Amino acid sequence: MAKTYDYLFKLLLIGDSGVGKTCVLFRFSEDAFNSTFISTIGIDFKIRTIELDGKRIKLQIWDTAGQERFRTITTAYYRGAMGIMLVYDITNEKSFDNIRNWIRNIEEHASADVEKMILGNKCDVNDKRQVSKERGEKLALDYGIKFMETSAKANINVENAFFTLARDIKAKMDKKLEGNSPQGSNQGVKITPDQQKRSSFFRCVLL
């Protein structure tokens, strides 16, 4: 049977329990919202195929449990991930503070050149906000990664976040393919052009 896609990208959603990872995933994969999801047990995944630059990209998106007791299971899935979304809840200060711990997990268990993005979820609940957008932006800048505020409930920026991450992964892959020589393959993941790309993103998105 012929393949129905040109690329397969494995993505991972990580963050504390209750920040809305499952809701973000369902909004993107099913265009649906359910406020009564129970906490993910272990790990689950959804698939959605999107089109970018005339190519069909199959996104396999893994939703991980945020509880400490599942940490050993979920970190095993970091290794093959090409993109990781770190999710916190803007109404929960602790979930934001823990993003640094989640980044340490990525550094320990994931590929060195994995694409990352921080999502401040539940931005529709502004009256209960504990974490300002500026703090989210600063944290992302500290680590040199992208940031967006999202709402699975109000369908704000969810689609944009996944498409942006997929586009960055594809750009990195294309760059590696272009430089298929021994020197070129290493240069495909140079830090400098990536940082330039990120800085231009912030000028456009974080206004």
UniProtKB/Swiss-Prot annotation:
UniProt modified residues of type Cysteine methyl ester: 204
Modified residues (Phosphothreonine): 72
Chain positions of motif Switch 2: 63-80
Effect of residue 72 to D: Phosphomimetic mutant. Suppresses interaction with GDI1
Binding positions for GTP per the UniProt entry: 17-23, 35, 39-40, 66, 121-122, 124, 152-153
Result of changing residue 72 to A: Loss of phosphorylation. No effect on the binding of GDP or GTP. Localizes primarily to the Golgi complex but does not affect membrane localization
Classification via InterPro entries: P-loop_NTPase, Small_GTP-bd, Small_GTPase, Small_GTPase_Rab
Keyword Phosphoprotein: yes
Main location: membrane
Swiss-Prot/TrEMBL cofactor(s): Mg(2+)
Highest taxon of source: Eukaryota
MF GO annotations: GDP binding; GTP binding; GTPase activity; myosin V binding; protein tyrosine kinase binding; small GTPase binding
Topology in the lipid bilayer: Lipid-anchor
Oligomer and partners: Interacts (GTP-bound form) with MICALL1; regulates RAB8A association with recycling endosomes. Interacts with MICALL2; competes with RAB13 and is involved in E-cadherin endocytic recycling. Interacts (GTP-bound form) with MICAL1, MICALCL, MICAL3, EHBP1 and EHBP1L1; at least in case of MICAL1, MICALCL, MICAL3 and EHBP1L1 two molecules of RAB8A can bind to one molecule of the effector protein; ternary complexes of RAB8A, RAB13 and either MICAL1 or EHBP1L1 are possible. Interacts with EHD1. Interacts with MAP4K2 and SYTL4. Interacts with SGSM1 and SGSM3.
Record comment: activity regulation: Regulated by guanine nucleotide exchange factors (GEFs) such as RAB3IP/Rabin8 and RPGR which promote the exchange of bound GDP for free GTP, GTPase activating proteins (GAPs) which increase the GTP hydrolysis activity, and GDP dissociation inhibitors (GDIs) which inhibit the dissociation of the nucleotide from the GTPase. Activated in response to insulin.
Protein name: Ras-related protein Rab-8A
PROSITE patterns, A to Z: RAB (PS51419)
